[in-house]
């Protein structure tokens, strides 16, 4: 069982994140979703809100303006309408 997975977050302007992480939480259409290593395949819409991930450098928070997420083969790809690091 893997203890990390790859997180990639993109906006139309740039790549925000490309990192190995231990866990991600984000605002899904029907509530908060959590993703851990070896998560089942998933495609979901994301609501505007906070995406939080835990990696080597600790906990990181991003504000996303909605979008979509796909989880497959220990890679989570997020296509966000907009995004920036949380203050």
Region locations from a protein language model:
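Compact, glycine-rich, soluble single-domain proteins
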Residues: 4-87
């Amino acid at each position: 069982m893997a203890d990390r997975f790859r997180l990639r977050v993109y906006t139309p302007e740039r790549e925000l994140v490309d990192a190995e992480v231990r866990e991600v939480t984000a605002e899904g259409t029907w509530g908060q979703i959590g993703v851990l290593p070896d998560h089942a395949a998933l495609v979901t819409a994301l609501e505007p809100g906070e995406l939080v991930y835990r990696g080597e450098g600790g906990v990181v928070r991003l504000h996303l303006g909605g979008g979509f997420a796909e989880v497959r083969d220990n890679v989570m790809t997020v296509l966000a309408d907009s995004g920036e690091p949380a203050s």
